[in-house]
Structures are given as structure tokens and as C-alpha cells.
């Protein structure tokens, strides 16, 4: 908090996790895997089994970063289900913490989980599991700003160790970050947050996306195409496999 910026990146498999772990403080197995890997239009279709299988793979690639797993839609609707599913995820995937979307509406659930020693990361602003229709930024109008600040302070009081702020207007994100002692991790929420998170596939240029907050830091799709093109060409020309690559 208020020191070195926190780096958070997503991973859905061992290979990606191994590379992400070299740079990330937090590796997030996000329910964004629904759109990235399965072409779902919404994260609501992601199941607990989806999250757990990918998380098990990710765990094998992590050595140093904190591993956080998104709890998918409808897996924490009440205290009983939330605790049962959270324990299952942590026990079977060996993750370090789970992430839930929401503030005041799920305060009793968060309180119950933390009381039972479940480490929780919060998520405020745009809540993908609750969105119907177009995604819109949050915190522009006074009432939203007030509620987001209130929810942030509430989550801090409940004991979450960090809060993701998604698509939160700049001045609101700055105010929240300055008003609480736990770290804020921004995604489309300005440079003023204590850290930043992006979907790794997006920032590496693997996905075609026009989301405003996504900056492409590499063009991995181009590199992949070049490699596959060379592979095909060498097979056609009978250059591969040469003696070096044959038994």
C-alpha cells in the first residue's frame, strides 16, 4: 500500500502461470476464462468445475506469487454455499485466496467466510457477474461515488486483504485508494490505484478486443502465426523432421 505498485495478472494454465509468476505479485485465475477460452458472452456461464480444473493447472506453475481464484456466479448466494464452495476450492486447488464480487449486498457472506479463516479479495465497481447488457463505468455520478466509497470502507472493516476496482471513474478510484488502508487493484480505474490487473491474453495481443482499458504490450498472435507458418512450410519442403529431429 502506497509503496511499489502491485502487479496482478491472469492465468488459466500451468504454462502461462509459469511465465506470469515471474512478474506478478498476484496471479488471478479469473472467471474471465469464460470469454477468453470458451467464448462465453458472460461470466455467468462459468462453473465451479471450470474454475477448479484451471486453478489446479495454474497452481503447478506458481512458485512465488499469491494465487487468487474467482468464485463463479451463484456459488456464494448464501453463507452455507459460500463457505462450502470456498473450502472446496482452497482445499482442492491449493490457492491462497478467493475473490467475490460485491459490497453491502454480500457483507454477511464475506463476514462469514473471513470468520472461518477464508482469505477474501473484494471486487467493486463494474461487476461482470451482475451485468445485463453493455458494460458501463462506475462512480461518475455522486450517488455511485458515495456508495463505492462506503462499500470500500465496509469491505476493509470486514477484513478483505485487497479490493479490485473495475471501470471506476478516476477521481472516485483515487478517493477510495486514499481513504482505505488496504490495497486497491485497478482495471480500467486509473493510475491512482495501488496496483493494476489485466487479462494476460489481452495485453499480449492474443485476443481481438476493443475494450478501452486494454493496451497491447505485445503481438503474440503474430509470433504464433509466424511459427506455425514456418512449421507448415518445412513439412511441405521436407525439411522437417531432419536427421537431427528423428530417431
Spans of model-derived segments:
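Alpha/beta enzyme core
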Residues: 1-218, 222-247
Amino acid at each position: 500500500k502506497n509503496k511499489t505498485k502491485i502487479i496482478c495478472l491472469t492465468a488459466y494454465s500451468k504454462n502461462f502461470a509459469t511465465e506470469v509468476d515471474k512478474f506478478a505479485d498476484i496471479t488471478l485465475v479469473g472467471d474471465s476464462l469464460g470469454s477468453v477460452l470458451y467464448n462465453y458472452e458472460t461470466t455467468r456461464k462459468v462453473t465451479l468445475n471450470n474454475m477448479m480444473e484451471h486453478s489446479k493447472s495454474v497452481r503447478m506453475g506458481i512458485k512465488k506469487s499469491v494465487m487468487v481464484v474467482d468464485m463463479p456466479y451463484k456459488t456464494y448466494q448464501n453463507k452455507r454455499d459460500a463457505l462450502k464452495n470456498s473450502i472446496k476450492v482452497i482445499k482442492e486447488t491449493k490457492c491462497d485466496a478467493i475473490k467475490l464480487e460485491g459490497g453491502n449486498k454480500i457483507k454477511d457472506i464475506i463476514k462469514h467466510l473471513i470468520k472461518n479463516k477464508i482469505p477474501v479479495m473484494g471486487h467493486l465497481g463494474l461487476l461482470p457477474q451482475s451485468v445485463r447488457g453493455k458494460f458501463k463505468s462506475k462512480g461518475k455520478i455522486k450517488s455511485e461515488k458515495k456508495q463505492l466509497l462506503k462499500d470500500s470502507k465496509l469491505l476493509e472493516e470486514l477484513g478483505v486483504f485487497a479490493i479490485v476496482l473495475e471501470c471506476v471513474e478516476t477521481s472516485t478510484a483515487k478517493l477510495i485508494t486514499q481513504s482505505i488502508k488496504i490495497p486497491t487493484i485497478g482495471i480500467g480505474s486509473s493510475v491512482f490505484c495501488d496496483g493494476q490487473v489485466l487479462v494476460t491474453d489481452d495485453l499480449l495481443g492474443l485476443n481481438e478486443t476493443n475494450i478501452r482499458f486494454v493496451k497491447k504490450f505485445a503481438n503474440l498472435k503474430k509470433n504464433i502465426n509466424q511459427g506455425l507458418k514456418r512449421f507448415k512450410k518445412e513439412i511441405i519442403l521436407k525439411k522437417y523432421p531432419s536427421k537431427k529431429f528423428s530417431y
